[in-house]
């Protein structure tokens, strides 16, 4: 920070396991990536190339190297995993991760329907090669998963080898953890937190109101994902009570 402002909440320093900010990239250029790193690299930890966008990006290896050289981890969106898995190309997917020198991968089932046991088998196999994040929740806003099932699946996926479980929201913030209006399913989140350690969860929260809600509930070191690159610094101000929405939380 540029100024000495007293009594701000403590933020974990990078590299960190909690207080993560995960940025979503939907097709930025090399120059845009350089600009993001220059302006904000100290405030985010990992970047996801959303859904299957990595299949269409120019200079993909160069983009990955840019972020890794800035100590920012990179992974492909879970939908890319699903695209390979549903076509019985799981081994091809592993080969791609190796070819692109990725140490992190996401396993999800938001667009495909597979038995949860099979999903956990994928997690177990993949965790032998890379660190695994796994995503819970459907991309279909009409599909409401009850809290007990979220908890059961999160626990099973962590036991299978996931390092973190991700609460689905999409980049729009209106499915999974949230109602179609973007409002948080508060009872769901609170019930999950009675059973699953908060440091094991990344909450997708692309909208400011959602970010504010999670910071107020869990604190400045809540793990948040699907953050737009141009909102990284904005989120950091929310985390430490230097934006109006959380200004009085940490005085």
Regions found by a protein language model. Name each.
Residues 1-66:
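Conserved N-terminal beta1-alpha1 strand-loop-helix module at the mouth
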Residues 17-31, 50-53, 75-89, 135-149:
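Active-site mouth loops of central-metabolism enzymes
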Residues 31, 54-67, 83-92, 110-130, ...:
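Active-site-adjacent beta->alpha loops and helix N-cap segments on the catalytic face
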